[in-house]
Amino acid sequence: SGSLRQAAFKGLREDKTAAEVTQAPQAPTDVRATPQAKTTTTVKPLARSGKGKVVIAGVTISSPDKVLWPARAGHPAITKADLARYYEAAADRILPHVGDRPTSIIRAPDGITGETFFQRHAMTGSNPRLKLIDVKARSPYVAPVDVGGLVAIGQSGGLELHPWGCAPGQPEIPDQVTFDLDPDEGLAFADVIAASTVVKAKLESLDLPAFVKTTGGKGLHVVVPIKSDARSRVTWDQNKAFAKAVAEAIRADAPDRFTTTLAKK
């Protein structure tokens, strides 16, 4: 109540001065009266495509009310339509990191309380909004290239996106080096944050700007963007060798805090 939602500018009154434009008085409510035209503060319902379906970014969402995350204290349930709307709203932030890159997807078609599985390759009936990327000696991978592709992942119950660190459209050419901080079960997240600052400082001492990404779990990724043009590009083997050398150097500096051979139980 009192909040302005999804306002739209319609134009200026050319027949009056600004001082003459005032808010019209509120008419008494009459349930028998003819319904008035909707105002610009009304949120339009989602477009419908057949019984029980909605359309988001041009993608038909079946079973939009299916609960993917159950309600918990203070938080309502999150539905498949909610997930699709989130992908649509966050596309500008997500696509620079996943767009046109082979992407593995953790899917939970029946929600997080049901069965989940890891999808790397195209499956029968894959949504046409997802691009297929050929990778040498492997089956084609799927990749979102636009907002519709992200929403299509939401339609399939895709909850996590794990893109390759390659140049867009070029799976054999890395465009980043990623250091995966995978904490021991007994470590607090504050310890992981502190470790990420150590790794970031080490990289910046090598004149390599880096940034930190959350992973969806307890770990963090420290990412170094690298050039992928014809003159500067490296191979995946070179990428991995460099990452291993830096990781070993960090472990040697602080062997009580880091290991490169952690095996989770």
Task: Report the location of each language-model feature.
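Helical (often loop-to-helix) elements that flank the catalytic cores of nucleotide-handling enzymes
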Residues: 121-138, 188-205, 224-258
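Short histidine-centered catalytic/ligand-binding loop motif
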Residues: 70-83, 180-192, 231-239
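Long, contiguous binding/interaction regions
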Residues: 92, 148, 155-163, 174-196, ...
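Intrinsically disordered, low-complexity regulatory tails
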Residues: 1-55, 60
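A residue-level signal for conserved active-site and pocket-lining positions in enzyme catalytic cores
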Residues: 2, 87, 179
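Short beta-strand
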Residues: 105-108, 210-216, 259-264
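Short, conserved phosphate-binding/catalytic loop or strand-edge motifs used
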Residues: 214-224
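Active-site loop/lid in soluble adenylation, ligation, and acyl-transfer enzymes
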Residues: 52-175
